[in-house]
Amino acid sequence: TNSHGIFSLNYGARLSYWSWNKEWLFSPRVSLGIIPSFNEDFTFRIATGLYYQAPFYKELRDTVTTGVSTKVRLNRNIKSQRSFQVVLGGDYKFKLMNRPFKFTTEVYYKALSNLIPYNVDNVKIVYYGGNIASGYTTGIDFKIFGEFVEGTDSWISFSLMKAQQKVDGKSFPQATDQRYNLNFFFSDFFPGTTRWKMTLKASIAD
């Protein structure tokens, strides 16, 4: 805390070892939060870190088809999928109809490497069994949260996103790619009592 505001710094790291492929993983992360002295209704955040996701069994399987025969082996040279992430965000607290509300915005970028791509065929998912792809995920999120009805919380969120991957020099959307997502959660009490509550959820995405 100083004349410029309140600062909050959090940092840490995780060290792990995977015996299957004898892989050591070091995952540092750090975040900084600031409540400026000129207006304590604002909060600003920045966070970054390096994250890993170890493969599960289906991602280890490397399938090779020769003629009419198919061989499956478990890839001992496979690596954990890696994501370097940066997030910038902010909150603004305000009053509306004399009730508390909060508006939140976050912008993020994730640089992805050592990806294990997969194909989706109806309900069947087939993994390539190797770290042959890279990519990125980026987007911006907006959310307004508060008491649209006094005494109970509701919120509306809207996200713009893009997720791409590159395999053999060719770029295309990831299977999880969405361009927008609108979510709505509303709660209200039954007339004359606060013991009974009704909630309504809706989501639109593409």
Residue ranges, per PLM feature:
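Signature of Gram-negative outer-membrane beta-barrel scaffolds
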Residues: 1-41, 65
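Residue-level signature of outer-membrane beta-barrel architecture
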Residues: 2, 15, 34-36, 50, ...
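Outer-membrane beta-barrel translocator/channel fold
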Residues: 37, 41-95, 205-206
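Outer-membrane beta-barrel translocator domains and adjoining extracellular loop/strand segments
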Residues: 21-27, 57-63, 115-123, 161-173
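Membrane-embedded beta-barrel scaffold of Gram-negative outer-membrane proteins
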Residues: 37, 77-136
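Gram-negative outer-membrane beta-barrel transporters
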Residues: 2-3, 7, 108-111, 130-206
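Transmembrane beta-barrel strands of outer-membrane/channel proteins
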Residues: 11-15, 32, 46-50, 90, ...
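Transmembrane beta-barrel architecture of outer-membrane proteins
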Residues: 1, 25-29, 43, 73, ...
